Design a protein with these regions (language model features):
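Divalent metal-coordination and catalytic microenvironments
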Residues: 7, 21, 26, 46, ...
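Active-site gating loops and adjacent loop-to-helix segments of metal-dependent hydrolytic enzymes
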Residues: 64-96, 130-138, 203-230, 250-253, ...
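Catalytic core of soluble alpha/beta enzymes
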Residues: 201-225, 230-231, 236-249, 262-272, ...
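Active-site microenvironment of metallo-dependent hydrolases
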Residues: 1-19, 24, 34, 324-415
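His/Asp/Glu-enriched, well-ordered alpha-helical/loop segment
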Residues: 223-230, 272-357, 373-374
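Metal-coordinating catalytic core of metallo-dependent amide/deamination hydrolases
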Residues: 123-237
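Alpha-helical scaffold segments that flank or form the walls of functional sites
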Residues: 66-131, 151-160, 407-413
Length: 415
């Protein structure tokens, strides 16, 4: 059992408290006084213990494309640069390239990712081997996977390990035919399950859907029964008031990817409006080929900055709400209700924020500092499922050079 003491704790009510935290095995055992003796003591030294970040949308194995095909709009980037290279990917590539992404997540205080990609067997193996938490979903489209494979994956990976789970999904309306979309809707009905996909990422995507079906992606997919049990819409940039009414009615998660949307010039999601309307909000980085960083601090700041610019209102968004979206919101979007907060009985997915870094001083408002001036260098420790995987700038029990070598080897072949 580990005792965390002598520092701040971000409580489940998002308040800063000063209590001892005891972690036993993979879970938070006790908050406050404990009669049992700890095996080890972690002196927080005045720093902050808080729930980890959760990355609610990514494509981890796309590390191969970092700085390889930049400065292009989404559809040119996908069709000319990414899809041809993805056709060459094999399972071992997915394993090696995902491992690299997992390392980067840990340095940003991210303990779990929501990954849409291929070869879920190798993604699950990589995540489990490292001790990282991954929620997977299907990238089903007209060219790969099938309704049967999605159902098979759903049943296999929801009982694979404590670190792995699987959600129904498909790539996007513009890459997936009506028959396949109908098949996913039937699975959602069968399992009473939410569905996740890219939606309303670009203006061209929305215009294309209106041309095909006479309505926006959100309205079309809702009509098809995709959101009968909720789900998530990655990006949610070009959404209308009518779309947001569907989000509200169905409990759809708007998963914001500010870095990727800015870099690809896709647009700015109306986050301030979403917050005012009570829309469920989560945050993701998108993949390392389109962002190109896997950095939750950058995402939080970009959301804040772009909203204020877009709205021409310095008070349009509250940084504390954005911090909640990156932690509790993303966790709930991913179905990770058991590791969303610092509370007794929750899984110990925790991070320590170094308050002694220059960017965190002076201490006027710790939580605002995390969003406005925080960066990856304030992550002192990342714990996943009760295991410390990253601490003081070092990875614990992980052969990083092997991971770098294997990822480079895969990248060289795909280039």
């Amino acid at each position: 059992m580990i005792k965390f003491t002598n520092g701040y704790v971000l409580s489940k009510d998002f308040e800063l408290i000063k209590e001892d935290i005891y972690v036993k095995g993979d879970s938070i055992y006790k908050i406050g006084k404990c009669d049992e003796k700890a095996d080890s003591v972690y002196d927080l030294n005045g720093n902050l213990l808080m729930p980890s970040f959760k990355n609610a949308h990514t494509h981890s194995a796309m590390t191969f494309g970092r700085s390889l095909a930049d400065d292009l709009p989404l559809h040119s980037w996908l069709n000319d640069e990414i899809f041809p290279r993805e056709a060459k990917l094999n399972g071992q590539d997915i394993y090696d390239l995902s491992m690299l992404a997992f390392l980067e997540y840990l340095t940003s205080g991210i303990s779990a990712c929501f990954d849409m990609y291929y070869h879920p067997d190798m993604m699950a193996k990589a995540s489990t081997d490292l001790g990282f938490r991954t929620v997977m979903t299907s990238g089903l489209n007209n060219f790969c996977e099938s309704i049967q494979s999605v159902e098979d994956y759903y049943n296999i990976y929801n009982s694979y390990s404590d670190l792995i789970s699987y959600k129904l999904g498909f790539h996007a309306e513009y890459t997936t035919g009506k028959e396949l979309i109908s098949g996913i809707a039937k699975l959602a009905e069968k399992y009473e399950a939410p569905v996740f996909l890219h939606a309303s990422e670009t203006k061209a995507e929305v215009e294309g859907c209106i041309k095909r079906y006479g309505k926006s992606p959100t309205l079309f997919l809702d009509e098809m029964g995709i959101f009968n049990y909720g789900g998530g819409a990655y990006h949610s940039v070009w959404v209308t008031d009518e779309d947001l009414e569907v989000y509200k009615k169905r409990g759809i998660w708007a998963v914001i990817n500010a870095g990727s949307n800015a870099k690809l010039a896709s647009g700015i999601a109306p986050v301030s409006k979403m917050l005012k309307e009570g829309i469920n909000l989560a945050i993701g980085t998108d993949g390392p080929s389109s962002n190109n960083a896997l950095d939750m601090f950058r995402e939080m700041y970009l959301i804040e900055a772009t909203q204020k610019l877009n709205d021409k209102d310095a008070a349009s968004t509250d940084p504390i709400e954005i911090l909640k979206a990156a932690t509790i919101g993303s966790a709930h979007c991913m179905g990770l209700y058991d590791c969303d907060t610092v509370a007794e009985g929750k899984k110990a997915d925790l991070i320590v924020i170094d308050l002694h870094k220059p960017s965190m001083q002076p201490i006027n408002n710790i939580l605002k500092n995390i969003v406005y001036s925080g960066s990856k260098d304030i992550i002192k420790m990342t714990m996943v499922n009760g295991r410390v995987l990253y601490e003081n700038g070092e990875f614990k029990g992980i052969d990083t050079e092997k991971i770098y070598y294997n990822a480079q080897k895969a990248t060289d072949r795909l280039r």
